[in-house]
Amino acid sequence: MVDTYTVNDHFINKDASVRALYDQLVLLLQTFGPIQEDPKKTSIHLNRKSALAGVETRKDYLLLNIKSNHAIQNPRIVKAEQVSAKRFHHKVRISSPNDLDEELKTWLEEAYILSE
């Protein structure tokens, strides 16, 4: 038997602001073009043709994992990992609508283009 998960499953017992942040994030990504939400057991993958980001929900914030083809040096990055020669994952904490700013939008647009 295969377990299936929904986006809503990830917001059970979470602050309502976390869902609002997620919805704003999805709207931001949709300014670049279509995306698909792919809920997994522990995260929600956001895909174009391939995954461009992943979202882990926490009690009162989101942990956003952005894919890139280069290292991003920035204090907002709470964790960075080089997963292959030309692939990096960068985790960013999203705690308020102010965190969904132009800088983050630039990183997400790069990830969107990369996932083509």
Could you describe each region identified by the protein language model?
Residues 1-116:
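Charge-dense, helix-prone N-terminal extensions
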